[in-house]
């Protein structure tokens, strides 16, 4: 919110000084069907921005779907990577169109902090399956890995309909992922660790 304008109305992703969550709705209930009667009656302690307080899950997803960006995010999960939940949460924060998990179907949802409920998630058994989906959807695969020859992300000209493909902690993107990608971008790092949490 613009602190220089005391009359400014906060946007959907701006926070107030209030505690996390709100109590039961005070006064007459709104009649709009996007509101959830249980939340109106009992209060809403979910980790959602204030604009979505008391809304049903389906109403929130429908509203997000009107505004999602064109890019997709994918992460390989051949070794049961523990970072996938964080990737899902970050994809939600940046309003990615979809998240794709490649490899094992099971993943650790803890890091997602229930944002997986608001994010479209698709599973692919192999990188080849992901590449086939990308071709059909008109998406350009861009691998993200700190490898020789990669283009620094801050200098790259990414296609609007990009599918950002992250590898796993440790091995990075697989050879199959490198071959499926049109380009590989790196994320600049200045500390001692070789990799960062993809989320």
Question: What is the predicted function of each stretch?
Answer:
Residues 1-199:
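Post-transcriptional modification and biogenesis factors for structured RNAs
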């Amino acid at each position: 919110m613009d602190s220089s304008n005391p009359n400014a109305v906060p946007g959907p992703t701006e926070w107030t000084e209030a505690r996390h969550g709100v109590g039961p709705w005070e006064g007459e209930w709104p009649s709009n069907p996007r509101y959830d009667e249980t939340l109106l009656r009992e209060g809403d302690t979910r980790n959602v921005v204030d604009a979505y307080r008391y809304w049903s899950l389906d109403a929130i997803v429908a509203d997000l779907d009107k505004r999602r960006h064109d890019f997709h995010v994918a992460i390989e999960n051949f070794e049961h990577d523990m970072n996938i939940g964080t990737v899902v949460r970050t994809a939600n924060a940046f309003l990615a169109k979809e998240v794709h998990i490649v490899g094992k179907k099971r993943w650790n949802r803890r890091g997602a902090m229930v944002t997986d409920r608001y994010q479209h998630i698709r599973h692919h058994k192999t990188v080849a399956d992901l590449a086939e989906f990308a071709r059909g959807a008109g998406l350009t695969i861009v691998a993200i890995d700190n490898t020789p020859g990669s283009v620094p992300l801050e200098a790259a000209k990414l296609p609007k309909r990009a599918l950002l493909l992250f590898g796993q902690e440790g091995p990075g993107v697989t050879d199959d992922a490198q071959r499926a990608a049109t380009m590989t971008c790196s994320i600049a790092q200045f500390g001692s660790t070789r990799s960062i949490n993809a989320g």
